[in-house]
A protein has these predicted regions:
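Solvent-exposed soluble domains appended to multi-pass membrane proteins
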Residues: 1-233
Length: 233
């Protein structure tokens, strides 16, 4: 990220979408190395209680998180020293799948919310108003980021921003209203009671099926939600 930033065209603004599999499963390195896997002692996390059946996976996942913490801290430290205004948004899309083997308290819709609920942070190297936006859907994160950067929204993102006032969370299986109520729906069914949601689904259908597959990633709501949002300057 730093290398791409330093090689950018400084005559114009730059945008970088960086996807990493750093902490993605499976978490089974020890199973292929006789119970051992290489990790620096300062990053090694050991689970001493619980997680009996998946303890190795839990330890690997948590140890990987310590690497991510250090890397993100280094990234923030670097950009905090840059003169150009910079905004960074960091988010994950779901928690580890092995938690389903040990978590039996939740099921159905509530389990989906908890397993797909992840925190996110929007940080800038200049002052931002601190705010916790609560639950929002992954598809709502892009317009929120653009608004934070004071970048004009396209008609599509304007539609998403308007929809988020009433339907802050929208996934492939359900949506959550601003009242906190949930509704389960199928993509084959058109919600008659919410005109903004109907407009969004029409918009989505146009972008996906009429504009071509290259628009797919821009428009389809992903089954991920943020459990908590945090603005920090």
């Amino acid at each position: 990220v730093v290398e791409l930033y330093e090689e950018r065209d400084t005559s114009r603004p730059a945008f970088l979408y960086n996807l990493t599999y750093q902490n993605h499963g499976g978490y089974e390195q020890a199973a292929f190395n006789g119970g051992n896997w290489e990790v620096d002692p300062e990053h090694r996390v050991r689970v001493t209680e619980g997680f009996d059946e998946v303890r190795g996976q839990a330890e690997e996942y948590l140890s990987c998180l310590t690497y991510t913490d250090d890397a993100f801290a280094g990234l923030i430290d670097y950009f905090s020293q840059q003169k150009d205004p910079v905004i960074i948004c960091m988010v994950g899309d779901h928690i580890p799948h092995f938690t389903g083997d040990v978590e039996s308290e939740y099921s159905g819709l509530e389990y989906q919310m908890r397993s797909r609920g992840t925190p996110f942070v929007i940080w800038a190297n200049y002052p931002l108003e601190e705010e916790n936006v609560g639950y929002i859907g992954m598809s709502q994160l892009a317009p929120l980021l653009l608004q934070t950067a004071e970048i004009p929204l396209s008609p599509f993102y304007q539609s998403l921003a308007e929809l988020s006032q009433d339907v802050p969370v929208l996934t492939r299986d359900f949506y959550r209203l601003s009242t906190g109520d949930f509704a389960i729906y199928l993509f084959t069914e058109m919600p008659e009671e919410n005109p903004l949601l109907r407009r969004y689904l029409y918009f989505e259908n146009y972008l996906v099926h009429c504009r071509g597959a290259d628009m797919y990633g821009l428009s389809v709501p992903y089954a991920g939600t943020t459990e908590s949002g945090d603005f920090s300057a």
